């Protein structure tokens, strides 16, 4: 028996032991679905047209153009991508890489603020500044606050003192340095307020008694008994308007009073309206004002003048569309035109704007539809009606969504849990947790049987079903089988990535016994 067993072993040259482990395989196709390559990564992230990230286990890499690991990103996950900076998170904190692959900050910080050529990092109350132009990191110290402005200035605060460490005079302190959505920093010194440009230089000397930002590069101030409207400029700021009469700036409304009476509605750089008899002004939208007069007229004022001429028997006028403006009288809403004439009498509790000559209205909790002549198109039986686009509106009743045409007729008899309009006239629909697609005439092109659905472009719809992903066209024809864990599309580089799990076979070879063994050994 032993002899037979020995002979059997001698006839076996190799013995295979298979061990299994799970890995992730990616196939890369062009947009004509021709296979280009195969990759082994757990995850691939496309951060931009040129920045691609690959992950294998705990190893995170910046990939080359041929999708090979080019730079190890050290950390375990991408924290944020703010071009050109890749913020990477690791066990000890956040660090930063330039998208070209250079590591500029170790993974040890709690927060990192980014600008296109610099980074501001912090741990607790300690701050560091990396400047790409000098390729160096500078310790700024223990601070109460530090920030990068939208023009790239560094402002720091310690106690009640502010300074700019990158300016030509980094040791100079200020009582206040405040940035805004404009291009200038509001500065305060003992001598007064001024404005500082992106170079850190004064373009308005600090001599103004009071100064506050309004919008953009404009400021409202007071100095030597004069009210000032100032516009920032990179070389020298300009006083656009000045007056010894009182100018107020409250609730984002600027008004001028002459001898104690309201006379002018102001904009950032001067007079918007000069009229007598005004009693009050209320802001009703961006650059939109209801102006009230002593003779009980009300008008709607816009950036370029009257949108609705002052008129009687109105309490409020809202922004409008298609030449009609919602307006209220005695607590009810109707529509007026730009001449200040009632077109649709005030009879509704609430209205929407007109869209394609149709608007929604309600008198109770339910909404209906009227046309621009005030004729009822749809009864007030809807919980919600969204604006008409290309002849269709999305409407909700009894918790379900329907498509409503301009005759007030629903195009789908069975409601959906939700309907989303796409940019090119299609409709994504959901029912019982499944998604589908309707065309511009509300006809079903993809049935509501998918767990997820994303229309990338014409005839290319990424779908998920039973936990797997694929691509179909708008007639339901399969483009890529619904058999993958994930699909990524990089249209700019003509690439489609499909992810799949597979189980590789690892073969362990046991060599045959050596023929040189002595007999009987």
Regions found by a protein language model. Give the residues of each.
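Residue-level detector of conserved, function-critical positions
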Residues: 24-521
């Amino acid at each position: 028996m032993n002899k037979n067993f020995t002979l059997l072993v001698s006839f076996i040259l190799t013995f295979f032991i298979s061990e299994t482990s799970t890995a992730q395989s990616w196939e890369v196709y062009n947009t004509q679905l021709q296979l280009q390559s195969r990759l082994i990564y757990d995850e691939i992230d496309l951060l931009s047209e040129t920045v691609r990230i690959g992950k294998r286990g705990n190893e995170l890499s910046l990939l080359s153009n041929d999708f090979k690991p080019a730079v190890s990103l050290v950390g375990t996950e991408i924290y944020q991508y703010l071009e050109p900076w890749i913020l990477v998170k690791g066990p000890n904190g956040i660090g930063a890489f330039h998208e070209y692959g250079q590591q500029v900050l170790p993974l040890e910080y709690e927060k990192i603020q980014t600008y296109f050529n610099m980074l501001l990092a912090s741990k607790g109350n300690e701050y560091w500044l990396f400047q790409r132009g000098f390729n160096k990191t500078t310790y700024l110290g223990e601070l109460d606050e530090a920030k990068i402005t939208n023009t790239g200035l560094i402002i720091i605060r310690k106690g009640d003192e502010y300074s700019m460490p990158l300016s030509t005079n980094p040791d100079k302190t200020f009582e206040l340095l405040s940035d805004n959505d404009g291009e200038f920093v509001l500065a305060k010194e003992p001598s007064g307020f001024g404005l500082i440009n992106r170079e850190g230089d004064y373009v308005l000397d600090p001599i103004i008694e009071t100064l506050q930002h309004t919008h953009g590069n404009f400021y409202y101030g007071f100095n030597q008994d004069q009210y000032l409207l100032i516009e920032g400029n990179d070389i020298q700021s300009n006083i656009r308007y000045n007056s010894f009469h009182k100018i107020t700036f409250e609730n984002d409304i600027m008004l001028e009073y002459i001898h104690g009476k309201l006379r002018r509605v102001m904009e950032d750089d001067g007079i918007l309206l000069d009229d007598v008899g005004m009693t009050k002004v209320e802001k009703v939208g961006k650059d939109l004002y209801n102006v009230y007069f002593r003779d009980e007229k009300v008008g709607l004022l816009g950036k370029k003048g009257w949108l609705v001429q002052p008129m009687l028997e109105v309490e409020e006028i809202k922004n409008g569309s298609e030449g009609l403006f919602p307006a209220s009288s005695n607590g009810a809403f109707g529509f007026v035109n730009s001449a200040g004439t009632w077109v649709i009498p005030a009879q509704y509790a609430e209205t929407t704007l007109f869209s394609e000559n149709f608007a929604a209205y309600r008198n109770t909790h339910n909404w209906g539809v009227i046309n621009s002549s005030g004729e009822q198109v749809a009864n007030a039986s809807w919980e919600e009606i969204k604006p008409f686009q290309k002849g269709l509106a999305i409407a909700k009743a009894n918790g379900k969504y329907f498509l409503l045409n301009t005759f007030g007729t629903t195009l789908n008899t069975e409601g959906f849990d939700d309907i989303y309009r796409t940019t090119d006239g299609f409709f994504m629909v959901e029912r019982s947790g499944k998604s589908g697609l309707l065309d511009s005439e509300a006809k079903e092109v993809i049935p509501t049987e998918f767990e997820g659905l994303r229309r990338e472009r014409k005839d290319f719809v990424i779908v998920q079903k039973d936990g797997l992903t694929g691509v179909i066209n708008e007639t339901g024809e399969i483009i890529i089988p619904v058999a993958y864990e994930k699909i990524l599309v990089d249209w700019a580089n003509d690439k489609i990535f499909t992810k799949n799990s597979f189980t590789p076979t690892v073969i362990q070879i046991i060599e045959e016994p050596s023929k040189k063994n002595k007999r009987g050994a």
